[in-house]
């Protein structure tokens, strides 16, 4: 029972698909996601096109990183994979997670801004991962 309380404490009852803004018919991909990510999302079968790690023209990409060095390397590549009206979520381990490294919300935001995207939302993915939603600025969308 204590484990159940720990996992649900402080987390929204909304589904992760809703929190992340994944829409039916979207072309989506995940990079370095935890093994349990698909079950955490609770994706409705057949409503999304889930594509591989190198696909482009994505409506939604969720990048999981554990340290600053990896994020600095991965962010520009991830940005190129999304459509100009697409969404890039970047997740990093929470400070209380056993996975925690040298990332924080401010560091992730700083790297995103330096790469020309803006953050528009923050969300708890689960007890181990936080996330920031990045999009292209309105003037940069086609």
Give short role names for the model-derived ranges.
Residues 115-142:
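Class I S-adenosyl-L-methionine
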Residues 84-94:
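Conserved beta-strand signature within the Rossmann-like core of class I S-adenosyl-L-methionine
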Residues 61-71:
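Short, glycine-rich nucleotide/cofactor-binding loops
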Residues 48, 78, 139-142:
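N-terminal and secondary-structure boundary signal
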Residues 72-84:
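A short glycine-rich, Lys/Arg-flanked "PGG" loop and its adjoining helix->strand segment in the class I
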Residues 1-43:
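N-terminal, charge-rich interaction modules
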Residues 47-58:
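Short acidic low-complexity segments
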Residues 96-109:
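Conserved class I S-adenosyl-L-methionine
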């Amino acid at each position: 029972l204590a484990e159940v309380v720990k996992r649900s404490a402080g987390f929204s009852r909304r589904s992760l698909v809703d929190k992340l803004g994944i829409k039916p018919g979207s072309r989506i991909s995940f990079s370095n996601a935890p093994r349990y990510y698909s079950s955490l999302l609770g994706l409705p079968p057949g409503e999304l096109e889930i594509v591989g790690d190198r696909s482009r023209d994505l409506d939604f990409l969720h990048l999981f990183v554990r340290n600053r060095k990896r994020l600095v390397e991965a962010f520009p590549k991830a940005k190129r994979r999304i459509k100009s009206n697409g969404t890039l979520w970047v997740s990093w381990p929470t400070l209380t997670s056993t996975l925690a490294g040298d990332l924080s919300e401010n560091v992730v935001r700083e790297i995103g801004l330096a790469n020309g995207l803006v953050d528009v939302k923050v969300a708890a993915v689960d007890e181990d991962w936080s996330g920031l939603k990045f999009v292209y600025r309105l003037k940069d969308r086609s």
